[in-house]
Every structure is written in structure tokens, then in C-alpha cells.
Amino acid sequence: MPTIQQLVKSARQKLVNKTKAPALKSCPQRRGICLRVYTVTPKKPNSALRKVARVRLSSGFEVTAYIPGIGHNLQEHAVVLVRGGRVKDLPGVRYHIVRGTLDTAGVKGRVQGRSKYGVKKVSAKSAGKSK
């Protein structure tokens, strides 16, 4: 424990919070270009083929971003919007691609949690016509 004299000479240092998404440079989202779209396997004990993309952001960073939802239309050179948010069972994946913006289509047939997957509301009229 420091003495009062030591505290007078130099005050206590404030702890600096480290950002969890440094590539976004304090912005909520960033635009980027897909360099490679591929699948990776998660850590134990999970098993799957998770869809991810290597993205070069407008901030100059190159990051790995997760593609949420079932099915996607992303290819190399697609322009995407990237937000923060890690995927717990994929080491090194600290970003998510936003569905339903720029070149990324929304998830087809999604009815619940639509806002997270870029899907417009299906009205009762149009739902009746499709059957």
C-alpha cells in the first residue's frame, strides 16, 4: 500500500479498457471486401462446418468474419458490412457479417428473429398467394 507522499508524487494509474474489436476503429460497423469464403471446424466438444469469410475492411485490417444463418450467397469480391461480436467456439473469429445489407442477402424462409438476419416481414396477403 502506498504512502500519502507516494500518492502525492504520482497518482494512481487508471486501467485502460482494451477494445474487443480493434479492426472497427471505434465504429459500429465497417464495410469490407470478401477475399475468401470457406468453412472451419469449431473447438471441442462442438462439431460442425461453420461458414466464415476473410474480409479486408475499409480501415485497412484483414479479419475473419462469421456468416450467420442458414445458407448464404457470398463469394469472393462481395462487398459486406462487418460488425463486432465473437463466435465462442471459433478461435480468432471476432466479427460478424451483417445479413441483408450490401451484397449479403437475408436468410430465406426466416420467420422468427428476422431483424438479426435481414429478412422483411411476410404479410398475410403475400403468404396466402405463395401457397
Curated annotation (Swiss-Prot):
Domain of life: Eukaryota
A single cellular component GO annotation: chloroplast
Example of a GO biological process term: translation
Single annotated GO MF: rRNA binding
Keyword flag Ribonucleoprotein: yes
Classification via Pfam families: Ribosom_S12_S23
Major subcellular site: plastid
UniProt keyword annotations, A-Z: Chloroplast, Plastid, Ribonucleoprotein, Ribosomal protein, RNA-binding, rRNA-binding
This protein's record includes keyword Ribosomal protein: yes
Task performed by this protein: With S4 and S5 plays an important role in translational accuracy. Located at the interface of the 30S and 50S subunits.
NCBIfam families, A to Z: rpsL_bact
Subunit structure as annotated in this protein's UniProt entry: Part of the 30S ribosomal subunit.
Protein name per the record: Small ribosomal subunit protein uS12c
